[in-house]
Amino acid sequence: MHIAYLFIGLLLVFSCLILWYQYHASTRLLLGTTYNHYRSVVSETANEMEQAYHSGSLLVELLANQRNDMATQPLADRLQHLPFYVTALRNSPKLAALYTGYDNGTFFLVRRYIPSAEMIRQFDPPAGTAWMVQSQTLNGDGKITGSYLFYNDKLTLLEQRGVAAYRFDPRMRNWYQMASDPGMLHSTSPYRFASGGLLGITLAARMVNAPGVAGSDIQLNGLDAMLQAARITPNSHLVLLNAQGQILASDLGLPGLLTNSLGIVHLPTLADTDNPQLLPLAQLSRMPPLQPVSLDLANGERWEGMPFTFKVLGEKRCAC
């Protein structure tokens, strides 16, 4: 009888060991598969951002090398070049706007109209608007005057509006100041565009034949949808950060903007978020890349994660 009990006990111990081994083996296999999946997500995200960059770089370089100088041209002369701008934007869906700013403070921009509450609030465009022109020119007194023009998809003018309050000095912008040498293409870090609030980057190059800078705004929209589609389980989360640790996108959608004590609007960091689903990722963002990390939270939950980093346009980005 004792031998039978001993035999049964040994079987139970052996069964427990087998179950324990299988559990840990399956856990390692699952984690390994998950990490490989997210490596693919990081690669896809990096490729998406690279493609966005290349879609605008050629157009900026072409614009920077044109012989046309619109710095002192009246609006009517500038509008002769509208078909070029619109054709360029039509063939580059990721481009939100194409523009030139000049050393005398004048400015000419053509953008595709993407309906949003913010765009309607800022511009109140007429029905049927497909393209918008924002222009600042010098009048006869040497003062800068602003205008908004709204066109339909066939480039028929719907409305021209003089805007006395429109004051946009391109010389004060980061993209203008960094483009100091002709022949060099420069890129900003991702940020929210002042018009429309879209997430994107700006490419800029000093013009060769005019005293100014050519630039383009490139949208990075769709990154949040990409991260949402990449989730393996309902409780898995992904966040894309820039080199400053600010949230560019997450599987929970685009983050809201914050305003600091100086009145400067900025993207939030993980430390700024009050979303409990993203808080565990704040610890991951401080860990060495490509190292699996186990996080034991105060509420008893255990999270497994891994930070990944990749470079786009010479800047380090981090995806968790």
Pin down the residues of each PLM region.
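Extreme N-terminal signal-anchor transmembrane helix of membrane signaling/transducer proteins, especially
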Residues: M1-R28, G32
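Solvent-exposed, extracytoplasmic
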Residues: L79-S92, M178, P182, R192, ...
